[in-house]
């Protein structure tokens, strides 16, 4: 649990200290690993299931965030918060594509991050691990602050001229389409939260049941006899 808490806090502190979109997102990769370590460290069905669900949520969200980082750099010529601005007015589609995964990353309802983090927090409370729950909530608050930092720097402040010419319209359409598809994936996690939780619980039970895991890997039945 100490490793989980430190990973959350060190990652999010590093993100807050950065002034570049891609570097902020890179530090958040570290921070989010801490949540998965939290679930695994609880060593309960609910905790491990929460870690699995959190992983499912993270895959599309992180994909979107880095794709949006690429869209920002493509439009502005760089991703430094000191050299970009005004995208909400000029490229509102990028603003929307950023806002959805950013709120999800911070665990704001009704997005997938809220569902995933709530499952971990509930598992932590039920396991009596209040300290790691508090750390997780603090890390989520700082995550929201770092996402707000990107929003204010890139989208909200006065526009700045691009340092390099943007790519062609055809290339922009391709990049926007890929990002929209990934955003749809984050929304699908919310829509399918029930079935995904059931799947996560089943995976957690199998992982915590050593014999079941051995049987699945070796292809044996409960009697230890190899399956045909």
Model regions: which residues?
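Cytoplasmic/organellar membrane-interface segments at the starts of transmembrane helices
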Residues: 81, 88-94, 147-228
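Hydrophobic transmembrane alpha-helices and their helix-loop junctions in integral membrane proteins
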Residues: 1-118, 122-148, 152
């Amino acid at each position: 649990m100490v490793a989980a808490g430190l990973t959350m806090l060190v990652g999010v502190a590093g993100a807050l200290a950065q002034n570049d979109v891609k570097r902020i997102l890179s530090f958040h990769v570290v921070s989010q690993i801490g949540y998965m370590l939290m679930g695994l460290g609880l060593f309960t069905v609910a905790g491990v299931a929460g870690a699995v669900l959190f992983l499912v949520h993270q895959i599309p969200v992180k994909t979107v965030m880095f794709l949006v980082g690429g869209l920002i750099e493509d439009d502005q010529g760089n991703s430094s918060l000191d050299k970009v601005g005004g995208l909400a007015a000029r490229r509102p589609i990028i603003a929307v594509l950023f806002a959805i995964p950013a709120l999800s990353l911070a665990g704001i309802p009704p997005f997938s991050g809220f569902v995933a983090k709530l499952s971990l927090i509930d598992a932590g409370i039920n396991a009596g691990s209040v300290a790691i729950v508090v750390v997780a909530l603090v890390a989520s608050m700082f995550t929201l602050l770092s996402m707000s930092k990107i929003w204010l720097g890139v989208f909200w402040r006065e526009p700045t001229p691009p340092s390099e010419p943007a790519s062609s319209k055809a290339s922009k359409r391709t990049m926007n389409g890929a990002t929209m598809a990934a955003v749809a994936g984050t929304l699908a996690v919310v829509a399918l939260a029930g079935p995904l939780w059931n799947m996560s619980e089943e995976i957690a039970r199998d992982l915590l049941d050593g014999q079941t895991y051995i049987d699945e890997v070796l292809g044996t039945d409960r009697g230890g006899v190899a399956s045909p």
